[in-house]
Amino acid sequence: MTSREIVRRNLEFDNPERVAYNLFGYDPYRDFVNAGPGVQTKATPWQQVDENTWEKTDHYGNVWRRVEDHSAGEVIRGALQDIDDVYTYEFPDFSNPEDYAPVRKAREEHPDMWLNCGIPFTFTVSRKLFKLDVYLMQLVLNREKMRVLHDKVDKMAEDKIRNLAEAGADSVMIAEDWGTQDRLLINPETWRQ
């Protein structure tokens, strides 16, 4: 039974020979391979700006900073500086099938493994475009304009998902973190809206 079949049978509760797993860096113990599109419209690599500080711009235009050369960093300046920017901001174009060549290559190189592609979704993209504190404030103060932004992010995600599937992905993983250990970051009533 191939890794791809093991994962499929796990998902379908169809008597797999074992539990599917993914221990990164240990090829004999891995059923998954990961890949993503090659769109890098506004992205720059990390650049050292002083002795301990590094900065980069992601493909959305957000400026990131990190301490040392090994931390993940955080957004220090979102691409959107004003709420009305939601109407004019140009998202990276994830609709071009040619940008999904890395996914097709992964499928060709690993035909017997489960090809998983992770993408950021509404909250992850939106909170970085404004920075988290400003984003949460805009959810309360400018709900209709935030719906405009969320619809645009969702359209971009739809393009990604469609192209990932056409390029050979078996699954698309979306991880959103709307909460702390014991509660939502926003009022539950706002969440429902």
What are these regions (language model features)?
Residues 17, 23-45:
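Segments that shape or occlude catalytic/ligand-binding pockets
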Residues 1-28, 66, 88-193:
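Active-site loop segments of alpha/beta catalytic cores
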Residues 66-89:
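Short, surface-exposed, low-complexity cationic segments
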Residues 39-57:
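Short acidic, Pro/Gly- and aromatic-enriched capping/linker segments at domain boundaries
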